Design a protein with these regions (language model features):
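Flexible hinge/switch segments at interdomain interfaces of large molecular machines
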Residues: 35-42, 77-101, 131-137, 176, ...
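Solvent-exposed, membrane-proximal periplasmic/extracellular interface segments of envelope transport
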Residues: 12-86, 147-168, 189, 486, ...
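Transmembrane helices with small-residue packing motifs
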Residues: 3-9, 54, 68-77, 333, ...
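Transmembrane alpha-helices and their membrane-interface boundaries in multi-pass membrane transporters
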Residues: 351-365, 387-406, 413-452, 572, ...
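Hydrophobic transmembrane alpha-helices and their membrane-interface caps
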Residues: 299-366, 424, 826-935, 948, ...
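Helix-loop junctions and hydrophobic alpha-helical segments within the transmembrane domains
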Residues: 276, 283, 287, 362, ...
């Protein structure tokens, strides 16, 4: 939300604008976080809704109502607060209108055609939102000489009032007869500069002069402009457009590109439109990559099935895979799911899992056919024995993924579709295994009875059986040895690096540059040209887009855009030839910018995955006194500067903004017939200008502004000679007669969070550094400083962590919030399936060990522990529980094994059960191989952790579970009802 108050200081903005708006908005219960930033001349507020809100439109309507309610109570001069609820999503396409001639660019012409381009993009079918960037804004300037104006006895405000009063753009009612209605209008509306020049202005002496005789009129862009944009160092105006959600991005972008081509053909000489970004290519590439991974995984899974199960069984399971996939995709639409990167990744993850039920059913039918059962008898017997265990294993695996689906917030929205796709695939797999596999068995499996395979033996099978026999003979020793692996993994967990989400795989990066708060937009633009020139010289850089005074258009989903009306801010978007070029240039560029432009704070940032945050590491200090907050901020900034990977530190609230203060002699002011209010109005009108109506030109309305010539407005020393006009001083009075001026420091910004003042101390890191490492170092330094007295927090002040750490902790907390309830549901499912608490305990002990196996796999891969790793380990636990259920059910099906007979248990493990476990493990691992070797940092760590963790989990399945079963269940007589 933006609430401009031109000329006001941050203290005035906070007290008169930000706090009243906050008080009004805090009555809306759905608002979870409300932040405000009071800068010179503007209040910027941002709000975050509660995760429970799923339909935001009614809330935005209530916010607008609250803003409308509070607007009349705000001081005169505060522009109507505006809610910008359309900026939370990335644009689908961004185009730039650029100047192609060698002559200086014509900003007015560029902005006019940029507006036309915006209109045409808005007409593309499926367009939701458009916006222009780098728009300075056209206006008509009435430039007056203060001495000449003073001689006429007029002030800027009086002249502006005379101009606006002469505008005939008004209605004068209606003439209503019995048969007609006639609207009465006035002639003389402002439709050209010549019309303005002919306005009669009455002086204080009663004379009438033409406006053109006492002022210079010119049409141009606002000076200084509110925003400027550059494309490769040349002036440009950018237009962004976003499609309506739920459409195909490739089809919409194709329509938008056709519109751009048609518009380019209509442009006059000197103008050209250039596409600088479109989302479709990134989406198509990503979907193409994951589709290839899906196909490769499918091929590997089927190939392994043929190697491990024989061609008849493999063909049966192989036919179940596409059937399961098709059923999964068919269920997407009724469930409100879409086909995108995350849902396809979910199907890839489920590839091995979806063959699990089919393998179990196929093996069971095959064994019964070998025993001579008919197809009907074999099917009936297999369904009777396996329907409930398969349902239990499917439900427990689904429940393992359920916390991810139930997780609220941005992180849940990001990974939720992956887990949902896995769950839908598991349900589809269960249905296919019960319906399709038995239907295929008479054709593919019944013939194995006529040709029973000759038993084959080899050294690996003999070694496997020997190891299992030793395990069953010495169960306690086997359990201790097996436990060493997961326990060791959990013990080494503190040594892992932590990363919330990995960096994005993008051939783009962005640079945020901040100058001192008092910097003008002209100074920032000059710096932009230098930075652009330097960046464009780097190898692999294709395009540089610069945005001065405002944030760049969102070209990536989690970039914060809250720098409106900030002349000291520069945002650059750099396009490179490849991801490799981005990774190569970013580290060195950060150092080069710091050395070449020490007057600015330059932060080179790669795009990141997951929830957005303002800075990688952040501390928030809450309190009331600005001086105390400033001092604490500087002390904490000093601690951050000591961290080895920190490049820049910002402590926002500082008294570092120079302010020109007028020390008013109130007696002299009163003697001159002036008040403090009239003095402020005259000085403000002379420096910033005074609105004086609108010039109507075709469909364009250009604001008219009366102001002093540039020399008077840009020279502080000229301020003393400013002439004040009053009824008592006809010839005017110099400002120096009633006030003395001096420079004083003032607050550059005042930030608030949830109705409290907060000092934000933010640290930026070198490229590819892990924020968690630096945050841990900072926490240690902070605790040491608090303990030894180097840093003292006054009563009523507190410090809280922000940045990546806060987002990570919040996301993990939300993920684990529903785990307890779902664990209870899983326990109930397994207990009811086996009618035994001991068997359920075996299952969940195995699941706990799988967690440790996942940590060991992560240690082996060398990746950081992040949010997607947590998601992967939760899935791994579900798979391990599934395998354990199958083994326990197999033991229970054999009367001798249930009683603890070693040979019977060995036969169960080394027979169809081991074939099932091995096939499922290898197929799941094979299905993940394409993701393991994929490019980027998001999916390889996930796939490697799950894949290798699953291989390690077979130790639990083959050694720990049989040993514990023999100790707990078999020794008790094997009766589930008694355990």
């Amino acid at each position: 939300m933006l609430a401009p108050y031109p000329g006001a200081t941050p203290e005035q903005i906070e007290a008169l604008v930000a706090r009243p708006i906050e008080q009004e908005l805090r009555t809306i219960a759905e608002i979870d976080v409300l932040e405000s930033t009071s800068r010179q001349g503007i209040a910027v507020l941002s709000l975050e809704l509660s995760d429970a809100v799923t339909n935001v439109t009614p809330v935005w309507s209530r916010v607008r109502d609250k803003l409308s309610d509070v607007a009349p109570s705000l001081p005169e001069g505060v522009q109507t607060p505006e809610l910008l609820d359309d900026r939370g999503y990335a644009f689908s396409i961004v185009a730039a209108l650029r100047w192609t001639l060698d002559t200086p660019p014509n900003p007015q012409l560029m902005e006019r055609y940029a507006e036309r381009l915006e209109d045409q993009l808005r007409q593309v079918a499926g367009t939701e939102y458009t916006h222009r960037f780098g728009v300075a804004g056209e206006q008509v300037e009435v430039m007056v000489d203060p001495l000449e104006l003073n001689a006429l006895g007029l002030s800027v405000g009086q002249l502006a009032g005379a101009i606006e009063a002469s505008d005939g753009r008004r209605t004068a009612g209606e003439v209503v007869t019995q048969g007609h209605r006639l609207t009465v209008g006035l002639s003389g509306e402002f439709d050209a500069l010549d019309r303005l020049r002919e306005i009669n202005v009455t002086t204080q002496q009663g004379q009438s002069v033409k406006l053109g005789e006492i002022a210079e009129l010119r049409r141009g862009v606002q000076d200084p402009p509110s925003a400027v944009a550059l494309l490769n160092g040349e002036r440009a105006v950018f237009v962004g457009a976003r499609m309506v959600p739920g459409q195909r991005i490739d089809a919409w972008v194709e329509r938008a590109q056709a519109q751009l081509a048609a518009f380019d053909d209509e442009l006059p000489i000197g103008l050209a439109v250039e596409e600088v970004f479109e989302q479709a290519s990134y989406t198509n590439q990503r979907l193409s990559d994951v589709a290839i991974s899906l196909l490769m995984g499918l091929v590997l899974v089927v190939a392994i099935l043929f190697l491990t199960m024989g061609w008849r069984s493999a063909l049966t399971v192989g036919l179940a895979i596409p059937a399961t996939t098709l059923l999964t995709l068919a269920l997407f639409k009724p469930l409100g799911m879409e086909i995108h990167q995350m849902s396809i990744i979910g199907i890839i993850v489920a590839l091995g899992l979806m063959v699990d039920n089919a393998i179990v059913m196929t093996n069971a039918l095959r064994e019964r056919f070998l025993q001579g059962d008919s197809a009907l008898a074999a099917t009936r017997d297999a369904l009777r024995h396996l329907a409930v265990p398969l349902l239990a294993s499917t439900l427990t695996t689904i429940l393992a993924f359920m916390p991810i689906v139930l997780m609220p917030g941005p992180a849940g929205e990001f990974v939720g579709p992956l887990a949902m796709a896995v769950m839908v695939a598991l349900v589809s797999s269960y249905l296919i295994s019960l319906l399709l596999v038995p239907a295929l068995s008479p054709m593919l499996l019944a013939k194995v009875a006529a040709k029973p395979p000759a038993p084959r033996d080899n050294i690996m099978k003999r070694a496997f059986r020997g190891t299992i026999r030793s395990t069953l003979r010495h169960p306690v020793a086997a359990m201790v040895v097996t436990l060493c692996v997961p326990v060791g993994g959990i013990a080494l967990m503190p040594t892992l690096d932590v990363a919330f989400f990995p960096l994005a795989d993008r051939d783009q990066f962005h640079i945020e540059v901040r100058l001192p708060a008092a910097s003008s937009i002209a100074k920032t633009e000059a710096l932009a040209h230098e930075v652009e020139s330097m960046v464009r010289e780097l190898p692999g850089v294709v395009r540089v887009s610069s945005f001065i005074g405002e944030s760049a258009p969102m070209m990536y989903y989690n970039v914060l855009t809250n720098e409106d009306n900030n002349p000291a801010f520069l945002h650059l978007i750099v396009d490179t030839v490849s991801l490799e070029a981005t990774n190569q240039q970013v580290p060195g560029l950060q150092q080069s910018l710091d050395k070449r432009f020490p007057q600015a704070q330059s932060v080179v940032r790669k795009y990141e995955q997951g929830s957005p945050f303002k800075a990688p590491i952040e501390l928030r200090v809450y309190g009331d006194d600005l001086e105390v907050l400033s001092s604490l901020g500087l002390e904490l900034a000093g601690l951050m500067h000591q961290l080895p990977q920190v490049t820049h530190v910002r402590a926002g609230m500082q008294r570092d903004l120079p302010r020109l203060v007028l020390d008013v002699d109130h007696t002299a002011l009163s003697d001159a017939g002036l008040t403090t209010q009239s003095l402020a109005e005259q000085v403000g009108a002379a420096l910033s200008g005074q609105p004086a109506g609108m010039l109507l030109e075709d469909t364009q309305q250009l604001p008219i502004r009366v102001r002093y010539a540039d020399g008077w407005r840009t020279d502080a020393e000229q301020l003393a000679a400013l002439r004040l006009v009053s009824d008592q001083v006809a010839e005017g009075l110099p400002l120096a007669a009633v006030a003395e001026s001096y420079l004083a420091p003032s607050w550059s910004v005042i930030t608030r969070r949830n109705a409290e003042r907060v000092q934000l101390v933010q640290g930026y890191l070198v490229a590819d550094a892990l924020p968690a490492v630096s945050m841990a170092q900072l926490d240690a330094k902070l605790q040491a400083a608090l303990e030894n007295g180097e840093l003292t927090l006054p009563a009523g002040y507190r410090i809280e962590t922000g940045g990546e750490a806060a987002e990570r902790d919040e996301a993990v907390g939300k993920l684990l919030a529903s785990v307890v309830l779902l664990v209870i549901a899983m326990v109930a499912t397994v207990v009811l399936a086996f009618n035994s608490f001991r068997r359920a305990a075996i299952v969940f002990i195995a699941g706990a060990q799988a967690m440790g196996m996942g940590i060991v796999a992560l240690l082996m891969s060398g990746h950081a522990f992040g949010f997607v790793i947590i998601v992967g380990i939760m899935g791994l636990v579900g798979v391990a529980i599934n395998a354990t259920i199958i083994i326990v059910a197999a033991f229970d099906d054999d009367p001798a094994a249930r009683q603890g007979d070693m040979d019977a248990m060995l036969a169960v493990i080394s027979g169809p059960t081991s074939r099932h476990i091995v096939s499922t493990t290898i197929t799941t691992f094979a299905g993940l191989i394409p993701l393991m070797v994929a490019a980027g940092g998001l999916w390889p760590p996930f796939a490697q952790t799950v894949g290798f963790g699953l291989l390690l989990a077979t130790l639990v399945s083959f050694f720990f579970t049989p040993a514990l079963y023999r100790l707990w269940v078999a020794s008790s007589g094997g009766e589930g009802s008694q355990t």
